Each structure stands twice: as C-alpha cells, then as structure tokens.
Design a protein with these regions (language model features):
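Sec-exported extracytoplasmic/periplasmic mature domains
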Residues: 55-58, 73-80, 142-143, 155-159, ...
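Repeat-solenoid scaffold signature
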Residues: 127-157
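Generic structural signal for hydrophobic core residues of well-folded globular domains
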Residues: 107-110, 141, 203
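The feature captures the catalytic groove of carbohydrate-active enzymes
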Residues: 2-67, 73, 80-134
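Non-catalytic C-terminal accessory modules of carbohydrate-active enzymes
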Residues: 73, 148-255
C-alpha cells in the first residue's frame, strides 16, 4: 500500500504462531486466504527482512536508498498505542498480543524511549506463546539487556516451558510445550530449539566474534554454581566453565 506496509498477503499462510491457541488472542482474522486489513506480525517480519537486506547492501558497498526508516514510521503510525506504550495487533485494534511486541523489539526498531516499556511487558507476560515465537521473545529480551529474565524464562517451569518437555520424558525437543498440547505433536522438532542458541550466544556469550578475538562477555547469572559446555565455533572449540565462583572461556584449536 502507499505507506509501504503489507496488507492482504494471500500468496501464503500469514504465520503468527502455532498451535492457534497460543497466539495470545491475536486480534486479526488469520483465515486462508487472509482477511481484510493490515496486521502487525507480518509487517514486523517484513521490516526485519528489509533491514537485513539493507545491512547486506552496506557490507557489499552497494548504493541504495534505505526503505526501512519510512517503514518503521508507518508501522508506528499503524500499530503503536501511546496510551499503553505497546504495539497493537492490527491497524484498528486496541489489543496488544505479546507477539505484536516481541518482534519490534527483536528486530531493533522500537524507539529507545519506548524499549523499556515493551521489554517490561514481555517479562510481565512470561511465556504465553508457542515454542516458535518463544525464540524471538528470549532473543528480544537479550537484545534489550534483560539477561537475568532471559535465563529465568529459559529455565523456568510451568505448562509452557522446556522443563515441561523434560518432565514428560523428552530426549529431544517437542513441537509443542507438551505431548498433549497439540493433537499431532512431533516429539523431535527443530523449531523448539531456542535454548541452544540463546544459552550459547546470549547467556554464555560464545559467538564467532569472540572466537576471532573480540571482547567476551558472559551473562550467566551468579546464582549458577557449576556449568561446563564445549561449543564448536569458527574452527575452534570454546570451552566455557563456571566453577567455584570463577567463569572462564578457553579457545582450543581443533586437533
């Protein structure tokens, strides 16, 4: 449409979350084909994609006219509700599903003076999404510097938790939070794998940049007494250890 936002994308499924009962009452009709109007999640993903493309163009020294600033302005006009400090689900809605606030924070286009309110909301709500969107929630909070809350959500219990999978005997990752939470739940599904990247990259601070000599910053809470993990990264092995109050990261060449 004229302001650059997407509406009535009928070429495929407008995925917000799955199963449907974990969309936090997202206030937009997600029928096939999609209903009339402009909704939040697909536009947040679109802006994220445009910003990623612009980053690649910069890295390649290509000349281009940035589109993302105008898209962010249009997104704010359509979905931001100053009376709550949150993003709404659709252009005409007053409801703010957690999904509608996870993605703007994750993709980094929430204005600096609005970030704390959005991050607080994600913490207050806890995990009320499916395993798919939980990845973006944890990553968004990490990018907002809320590492203690990330670790708490990652290791917490309840019906919507990875601990619930373990309590049900999981040896891999389920497609849903529990075997009976979806009628045909796969008991080995990669879209529940948020703990892998979040623990390694955001909590332990092990990234390719660190392996190449950048400053290493761990965000593992002091309450964790012992942890040891070996992570293959950038042609090396990163050995992370927390023991007796000491935290170390040793880079070993693969032999």
């Amino acid at each position: 449409r004229e302001d650059g936002l997407l509406e009535k994308v009928v070429e495929g499924w407008n995925l917000v979350d799955w199963p449907a009962n974990l969309r936090d009452e997202y206030d937009f009709s997600l029928t096939l084909p999609i209903g009339e109007g402009c909704h939040n999640v697909i536009n947040a993903f679109y802006i994220g994609a445009v910003r990623a493309y612009e980053t690649m163009q910069k890295l390649l020294d290509e000349e281009f006219t940035p589109k993302s600033p105008a898209l962010v302005d249009a997104f704010d006009r359509a979905f931001y509700r100053p009376e709550t400090g949150l993003y709404a689900d659709s252009e005409t809605s007053a409801h703010s599903a957690v999904h509608s606030n996870i993605l703007p924070l994750y993709f980094g286009f929430v204005a600096r003076d609005k970030r704390a309110r959005v991050a607080d909301y994600l913490v207050e709500r806890g995990i009320c999404t499916g395993v798919y969107m939980a990845f973006f929630q944890l990553k968004a909070l990490a990018r907002a510097g809320r590492y203690d809350e990330v670790y708490r959500l990652l290791t917490g219990g309840g019906e919507h938790s990875w601990k619930n999978m373990l309590d049900e005997g999981a040896t891999t990752l389920f497609e849903a939070w529990g075997k009976e939470q979806k009628w045909n739940t796969s008991l080995c599904h990669p879209w529940a794998s948020a703990p892998v990247s979040v623990l390694i990259e955001d909590i332990l601070g092990v990234t390719p940049d660190v392996a190449r000599g950048e400053i290493w910053r761990s965000h593992l809470p002091e309450s964790v007494g012992y942890l040891r993990m070996v992570v293959p990264v950038a042609g090396q092995r990163a050995v992370f250890t927390r023991e007796n109050g000491q935290t170390t990261l040793i880079l070993e060449q693969k032999g």
